[in-house]
């Protein structure tokens, strides 16, 4: 690590020590519950998808979900003159999805060479924070869609998308509302000419039909599509206007020009390449245990010429209204490529 880098890194640690009001500069420490909301703000700033969904702080590690919204009819009439009684109807689901926040580690290492490159920038502190947060955010999203189980020791080689880190949103549907999963009648779901669904749009409509009827015509529904399906359909994206003079620090969630199943379509980062999910952004949540954010400022490892950070949080992926979400069994999807199903 260059001398200039070392000076800037020490200043960074001094700054963070004051921010978190901790005496620990080298080891890990728990973030005070009063500052936990700031951790969520950092997540939202660096990824558009995370800025659209619910990031919720909870004080209990196990409970039932909050159940934001229900879609139930509350408009009614009651003849009170004849003795009728107006009875308010609950706007949240009668039974929420159970949750259990489980520890997930986000340990990382950055080479001294990379840090030396950042040290030439005036915004070294921001650059360092963004890079660390970006990688954590992408994994947070990836596990949300791919996660199937919680292993005592996850295996990246066998589960490169974090399938064994913790259960994600699609697994929540498998576990708590299996009827919301569009599964193959045999071993495959074929999309394309002579397949089960001739077009991607037909497949999306079939997934949409899996959600409760009262939700299907609400205009907040969206469809999330994987990159293979977008490419198969030769779909194009809206191009956002970007000021070339302003740096872009938030990972964009790309919106597709075409609508599918009469819904706007998006392709978030790390979504399964052949995945389809119909829901609303505010129906997807990640619950974080407020007292369980553990951070570190980075520990020097001169033996390996790198800076190591050991961080963790306790979290759970939640679908607020299970009957307002549906997804395809993306592992079973095959596409017609020149007459061959692959």
How would you name each of these model-derived features?
Residues 96, 105, 129, 218-220:
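Extracellular structured ligand-interaction cores
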Residues 2-47, 164-186, 228-342:
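Sequence/fold signature of self-assembling virion shell proteins
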Residues 101-103, 218, 304-306:
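A general secondary-structure signal for short beta-strands and their flanking turns/coil
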Residues 110-112, 227:
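Short, structured patches in soluble enzyme cores that scaffold and shape functional sites
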């Amino acid at each position: 690590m260059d001398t200039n880098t070392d000076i800037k890194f020490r200043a960074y640690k001094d700054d963070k020590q004051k921010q978190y009001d901790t005496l620990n500069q080298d080891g890990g420490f728990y973030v005070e519950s009063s500052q936990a909301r700031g951790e969520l703000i950092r997540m939202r700033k660096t990824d558009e998808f995370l800025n659209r969904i619910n990031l919720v702080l909870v004080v209990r590690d196990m409970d039932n979900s909050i159940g934001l919204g229900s879609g139930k009819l509350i408009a009614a009439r009651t003849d009170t003159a004849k003795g009728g009684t107006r009875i308010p109807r609950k706007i949240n689901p009668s039974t929420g999805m159970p949750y259990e926040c489980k520890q997930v580690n986000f340990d990382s290492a950055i080479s001294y060479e990379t840090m030396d490159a950042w040290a030439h920038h005036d915004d070294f502190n921001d650059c360092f924070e963004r890079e660390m947060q970006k990688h954590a955010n992408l994994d947070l999203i990836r596990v949300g869609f791919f996660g199937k189980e919680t292993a005592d020791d996850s295996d990246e080689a066998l589960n490169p998308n974090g399938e064994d880190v913790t259960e994600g949103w699609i697994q929540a549907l498998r576990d708590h509302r299996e009827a919301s999963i569009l599964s193959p009648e045999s071993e495959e779901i074929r999309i394309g000419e002579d397949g089960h669904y001739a077009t991607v749009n037909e497949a999306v409509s079939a997934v949409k039909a899996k959600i409760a009827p009262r939700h299907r015509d609400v205009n907040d529904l969206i469809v999330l599509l994987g990159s293979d399906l977008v490419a198969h359909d030769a779909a194009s994206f809206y191009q956002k206007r970007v000021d070339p003079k302003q740096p872009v620090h938030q990972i964009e969630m790309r919106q597709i020009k075409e609508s599918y199943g009469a819904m706007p379509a998006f392709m978030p980062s790390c979504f399964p390449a052949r995945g389809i999910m119909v829901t609303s952004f505010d129906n997807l949540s990640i619950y974080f245990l407020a007292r369980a954010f553990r951070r570190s400022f980075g520990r020097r490892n001169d033996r390996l010429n790198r800076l190591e950070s050991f961080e963790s949080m306790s979290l759970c992926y939640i679908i607020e209204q299970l009957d307002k979400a549906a997804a395809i069994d993306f592992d079973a999807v095959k596409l017609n490529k020149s007459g061959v199903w692959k």
